[in-house]
C-alpha cells in the first residue's frame, strides 16, 4: 500500500524517479493524438508521471532519451487460449510482444482437459519466463459438459479451491456449462462458491438465444 505514497512523492519531485524516459512521442489513446516531447517517470515498476519529468530526475535516476520514438500503452488481450495455437506461452510472446501486446488473460482450458491441474501449472510457470504479463483463470469446465465427452482429467470444486491459492490465478475460467448453472448442479455451483470465497472473478460463457429466464438464472 506504500506504493501510492511513493508515486505521489515521485510525481511531485520530492522523491526522485528510478528511471525517466525523455523526449518521446506519446500515442495518447484517450485523446486520439500524438503528443511530442513527452517524458515518463517510473518508480517501483510503475508510471508516476507522464509529461515534463525534469523535476523527477536525481543523481541516481537512469535517463533514457527516446529521441522522438513512439511510446504507447500496451495492448491487453482479454481472453485467449494460448495452447489452442499449439505453442507455449513463451513462443506466443515472441509473436505478439513485438506487435504491442504486453498482457494477456489466458484460460488454459484445453491443456487442463488433457493434463489436469498440472497442465495449468505448466502454462503459468512458462508465462513467468516470458516478457508477457500473463494472468490466468482456473479452467471451470473439465470436461466442458460432463457426460458429453471424454477427457484426460476432471476438475472438481476442491481443485478450484486449490488453484485459487496459486500465484498467477485471477479467477474462474469461462463457465461454459450453462445447463448446469441454470440447473443448479452441485459441483458447478460449488466451483462458483469457491471462486467467490477467494474474492476472485467469475467469467461467463452463455451461448443460447434464451434471453429470458435462462439468461437471468445464469447471471444470478
Regions found by a protein language model. Name each.
Residues 69-92:
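Di-metal (Zn2+ and/or Mg2+/Mn2+) metal-binding site signature of metallo-dependent hydrolases
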Residues 24, 45, 68, 79, ...:
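Divalent metal-coordination and catalytic microenvironments
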Residues 1-20, 25-73:
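Histidine-rich, glycine-flanked metal-binding segment
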Residues 13, 20, 41, 97-99, ...:
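Hydrophobic alpha-helical bundles that form the membrane domains of multi-pass transporters
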Residues 1-10, 15, 90-201:
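Divalent-metal coordination cores built from histidine and acidic residues
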Amino acid at each position: 500500500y506504500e506504493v501510492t505514497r511513493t508515486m505521489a512523492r515521485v510525481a511531485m519531485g520530492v522523491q526522485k524517479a528510478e528511471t525517466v524516459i525523455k523526449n518521446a512521442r506519446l500515442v495518447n489513446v484517450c485523446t486520439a493524438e500524438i503528443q511530442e516531447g513527452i517524458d515518463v517517470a517510473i518508480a517501483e515498476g510503475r508510471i508516476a508521471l507522464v509529461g515534463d519529468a525534469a523535476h523527477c530526475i536525481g543523481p541516481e535516476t537512469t535517463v533514457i532519451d527516446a529521441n522522438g520514438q513512439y511510446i504507447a500503452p500496451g495492448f491487453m488481450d482479454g481472453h485467449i487460449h494460448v495452447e489452442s495455437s499449439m505453442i507455449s506461452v513463451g513462443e506466443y510472446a515472441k509473436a505478439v510482444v513485438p506487435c504491442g501486446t504486453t498482457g494477456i488473460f489466458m484460460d488454459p482450458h484445453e491443456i487442463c482437459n488433457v493434463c489436469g491441474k498440472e497442465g495449468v501449472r505448466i502454462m503459468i510457470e512458462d508465462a513467468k519466463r516470458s516478457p508477457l504479463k500473463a494472468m490466468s483463470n482456473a479452467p471451470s469446465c473439465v470436461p466442458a459438459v460432463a457426460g458429453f465427452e471424454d477427457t484426460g482429467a476432471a476438475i472438481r470444486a476442491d481443485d478450484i479451491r486449490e488453484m485459487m491459492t496459486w500465484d498467477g490465478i485471477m479467477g474462474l475460467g469461462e463457465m461454459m456449462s450453462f445447463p448446469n448453472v441454470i440447473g443448479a448442479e452441485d459441483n458447478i455451483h460449488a466451483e462458483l462458491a469457491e471462486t467467490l470465497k477467494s474474492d476472485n472473478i467469475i467469467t461467463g460463457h452463455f451461448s443460447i438465444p434464451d434471453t429470458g429466464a435462462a439468461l437471468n438464472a445464469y447471471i444470478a
